[in-house]
Amino acid sequence: MAVPKRKPSVSRRKIRNVFIRAEMKKNLSNYSICKHCNYVKKKHHICNNCGYYKESLIYKIV
């Protein structure tokens, strides 16, 4: 198993974490809340809970 030769400095750790957190925020911004049922859904997609997309019913959930 690989072991680091030196302890990473605080500044290097912070720089790495900034990029990791930026990726996480980017992934979270792809989601929104459905206006009809307040369910979390992907933006520009049909809601899996109620079947609505932009104020119109696309398919009926039984």
Curated annotation (Swiss-Prot):
Could you tell me what this protein is called? Large ribosomal subunit protein bL32m
Main location group: mitochondrion
What keywords are assigned to this protein?
Mitochondrion, Ribonucleoprotein, Ribosomal protein
Q: Where in the cell is it found?
A: Mitochondrion
InterPro entries named in the record: Ribosomal_bL32, Ribosomal_bL32_bact, Ribosomal_zn-bd
What the entry lists under SUPFAM superfamilies is as follows: Zn-binding ribosomal proteins (SSF57829)
Kindly state one GO CC term assigned in the UniProt record: large ribosomal subunit
The UniProt record lists the keyword Ribosomal protein:
yes
GO BP terms: namely: translation
Q: Name one Pfam family in it.
A: Ribosomal_L32p
For this UniProt entry, which segments traverse the membrane? none
A GO MF annotation of the entry reads: structural constituent of ribosome
Task: Write down the PANTHER family for this protein, in alphabetical order.
Answer: 50S RIBOSOMAL PROTEIN L32, LARGE RIBOSOMAL SUBUNIT PROTEIN BL32
* Similarity annotation: Belongs to the bacterial ribosomal protein bL32 family.
